[in-house]
């Protein structure tokens, strides 16, 4: 679509730089990528657009009409193109007059002329009509045949040329004077550009020398000056927070001074702050006063405290974060920590922040833990050597001396740091509605839970239930081993009590348990179960206890204590010692009756019935022995099975009657 970005950038390089500077002075920042996209669309649908660019408002209105027609025909115009077109069109409106036909290629000569020195010599009436720090020279000519493009660069890019050392030196802004349209002194206007000469030569041409200024609402208004980094300002004491750094001032030497307090500028400044958390101002700003104001000569300058409330967007983001993620989610803790350490928050700020973000029940918890933390901190302040002069009223922002915002804004850095630490600890103890804080004894690692997740849960519970930091650290290190699963305990056991000083115990435990529960660890456990060999520094052992001696590693039938007792009993009962080798397994000095080996010395399996006698045939029970019927002709041969059953069926049947008994001869 259209030309490539590189061609567009090289073709309109000068015009793009001018447009960016123009928009920047109006308080709008547009990326080069979006501008290149805009000119790609213009190249496609507006081929008449001049290569040197144009400042004519009619041309930009025509561009808008043709882009709308292209959109009606089905062509896709990105939204950023419409936004950039509207911004450029709005920025060019203040520069137009009734006879506006401004082209960048038609602007010869330098448009930056310092009028301060010459205008001071004129009468007060003339100087009041001058509001020219920098005056615009003629920007209208009928042809471009005699255009000097070196001068053209000075016209459009004075700031760039100054940085490169090619342009004229720019003089700083002078006193703000009423806006006027007085002509330039004749000595400062080039001869070729003097309007009187050109008008006489060609009266049909419009005036070529005039001054133009944007409305006061669009003029750049610098921020209030602040004497940060004053040479006589003492450095911040060690161990305390440094003085707040001043915001970076934008240098705009070519913009004329404008009236302060413009309502539009206040809206623009407010909109800039919204959506950019890094631009949030400190609620309490410290500004050192110059010598002579509140301090005598030779004394360090005093510091003036100025309070500024939170922005509505920041409070809204805090409320949405607490509602969506919870007050103690990682996101909210990180956001709160950045706000607390990036701002100089007084007790009033903490109360407003908590009230606007938390539920009533959560705010009650926060206030309760805040008061408890203040009581503990006051005790530590009194016990310090020397004692710290910070009382409970100051840390809570109450009482006759610390109840107002102006009084709290004068708090020392040490008190601000103590309030920050107390409120952060109180915020961490807030519980979600309907949830209870479990005891650290009940936090145990499941068989499939990763060890870092278990330690994170343990630390979270300990942080909410144990206030003392040293006690919390000891409890976490102890429970990290005691409440871990057996696999992690076996990996941590060699490190327990042997972690070198200066190293974090929990970090070493996490390193030792890295990989437990994974595929590689499961394969190692399976190999240990099959082979029983040492793998990865761990030995496969039997985990049960012997019912005879109570020791771990063998069963009762293999208990060495029981075997020794049996050998002693056998020796005392038989009166003789066991043979040299067992006749059964041939690999131990014990009796064969006590041999429990399953393999002989050659590795062949042994039968468990070796010591028993030969099995005997079952005895017949009944009145008469059953003799099989053998038909004639089959003596000495195996009769057929059918004939055997036939013979059995011919036997007398005895139901419930007793069998006949032989008569007893007397």
UniProtKB/Swiss-Prot annotation:
Ranges of compositional bias, category Polar residues: 604-622
Name the InterPro entries for this protein: B_retro_matrix, B_retro_matrix_sf, Gag_p24_C, Primate_lentivir_Gag_pol-like, Retrov_capsid_C, Retrov_capsid_N, Retrovr_matrix, Znf_CCHC
Q: Where are the zinc fingers (CCHC-type)?
A: 544-561, 580-597
What is a GO molecular function of this protein? nucleic acid binding
A Gene Ontology annotation in the biological process aspect, one of them, is:
viral translational frameshifting
Signal sequence span is: none
Q: Residues with N-myristoyl glycine lipidation?
A: 2
The cross-references to Pfam families, in alphabetical order and at most eight, read:
Gag_p10 (PF02337), Gag_p24 (PF00607), Gag_p24_C (PF19317), zf-CCHC (PF00098), zf-CCHC_5 (PF14787)
Pro residues bias located where? 232-247
Functional note: The products of the Gag polyproteins of infectious retroviruses perform highly complex orchestrated tasks during the assembly, budding, maturation, and infection stages of the viral replication cycle. During viral assembly, the proteins form membrane associations and self-associations that ultimately result in budding of an immature virion from the infected cell. Gag precursors also function during viral assembly to selectively bind and package two plus strands of genomic RNA. Endogenous Gag proteins may have kept, lost or modified their original function during evolution.
Family statement: Belongs to the beta type-B retroviral Gag protein family. HERV class-II K(HML-2) gag subfamily.
User: Under what name is this protein listed?
Assistant: Endogenous retrovirus group K member 21 Gag polyprotein
UniProt organism field: Homo sapiens (Human)
């Amino acid at each position: 679509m259209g030309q490539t970005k590189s061609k567009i950038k090289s073709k309109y390089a000068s015009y793009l730089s001018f447009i960016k500077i123009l928009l920047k002075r109006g308080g709008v920042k547009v990326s080069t990528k979006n501008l290149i996209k805009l000119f790609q669309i213009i190249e496609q649908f507006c081929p008449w657009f001049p290569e040197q660019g144009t400042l004519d408002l009619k041309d930009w209105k025509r561009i808008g009409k043709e882009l709308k027609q292209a959109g009606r025909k089905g062509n896709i115009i990105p939204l950023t193109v419409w936004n950039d077109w509207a911004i450029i069109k709005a920025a060019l409106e203040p520069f137009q007059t009734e006879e506006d036909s401004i082209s960048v290629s038609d602007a010869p000569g330098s448009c930056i002329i310092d009028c301060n020195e010459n205008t001071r010599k004129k009468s007060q009436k003339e100087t009041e009509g001058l509001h020219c720090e920098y005056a615009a020279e003629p920007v209208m000519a009928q042809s471009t045949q005699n255009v000097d493009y070196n001068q053209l660069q000075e016209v459009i890019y004075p700031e760039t040329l100054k940085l490169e050392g090619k342009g004229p030196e720019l003089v700083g802004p002078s006193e703000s004077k009423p806006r006027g349209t007085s002509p330039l002194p004749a000595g400062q206007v080039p001869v070729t550009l003097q309007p009187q000469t050109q008008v006489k030569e060609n009266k049909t041409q419009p005036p070529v020398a005039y001054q133009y200024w944007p409305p006061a609402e669009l003029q750049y208004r610098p921020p209030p000056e602040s004497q940060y980094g004053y040479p006589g300002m003492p450095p911040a004491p060690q161990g305390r927070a440094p003085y707040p750094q001043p915001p970076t001032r934008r240098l705009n030497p070519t913009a004329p001074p404008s009236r302060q307090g413009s309502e539009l500028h206040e809206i623009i400044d407010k909109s800039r702050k919204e959506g950019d958390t890094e631009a949030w101002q400190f609620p309490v700003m410290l500004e050192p006063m110059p010598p002579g104001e509140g301090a005598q000569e030779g004394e360090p300058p005093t510091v003036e405290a100025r309070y500024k409330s939170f922005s509505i967007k920041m409070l809204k983001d805090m409320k949405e974060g607490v509602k969506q993620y919870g007050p103690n989610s990682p996101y909210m803790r990180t956001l709160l920590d950045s706000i607390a350490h990036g701002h100089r928050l007084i007790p009033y700020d903490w109360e407003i922040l908590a009230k606007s973000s938390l539920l009533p029940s959560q705010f009650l918890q926060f206030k309760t833990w805040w008061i408890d933390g203040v009581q503990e901190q006051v005790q530590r302040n009194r016990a310090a050597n020397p004692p710290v002069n910070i009382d409970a009223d100051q840390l809570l922002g109450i009482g006759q001396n610390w109840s107002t915002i102006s009084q709290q804004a004068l708090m020392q850095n040490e008190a601000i740091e103590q309030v920050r630490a107390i409120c952060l600890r109180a915020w961490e103890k807030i519980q979600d509605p309907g949830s209870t804080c479990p005891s650290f004894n009940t936090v145990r690692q499941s068989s499939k839970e990763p060890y870092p997740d278990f330690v994170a849960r343990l630390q979270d519970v300990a942080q909410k239930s144990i206030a003392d930091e040293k006690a919390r650290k000891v409890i976490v290190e102890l429970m990290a081993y005691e409440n871990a699963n057996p696999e992690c305990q076996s990996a941590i056991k060699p490190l327990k009590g042997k972690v070198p000083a200066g190293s974090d115990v929990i970090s070493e435990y996490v390193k030792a348990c890295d990989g437990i529960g994974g595929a590689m660890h499961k394969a190692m456990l399976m190999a240990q179960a099959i082979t029983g060999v040492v793998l990865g520094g761990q030995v496969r052992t039997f985990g049960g206890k012997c019912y005879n001696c109570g020791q771990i590693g063998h069963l009762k039938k293999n208990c060495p204590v029981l075997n020794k007792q049996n050998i002693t009993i056998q020796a005392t009962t038989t009166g003789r010692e066991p043979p040299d080798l067992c006749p059964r397994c041939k690999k131990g000095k014990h009796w064969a009756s006590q041999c429990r080996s399953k393999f002989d010395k050659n590795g062949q399996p042994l039968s468990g019935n070796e010591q028993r006698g030969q099995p005997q045939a079952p005895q017949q029970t009944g009145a008469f022995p059953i003799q099989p019927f053998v038909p004639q002709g089959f003596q000495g041969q195996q009769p057929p099975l059918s004939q055997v059953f036939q013979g059995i069926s011919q036997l007398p049947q005895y139901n419930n009657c007793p069998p006949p008994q032989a008569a007893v001869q007397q």
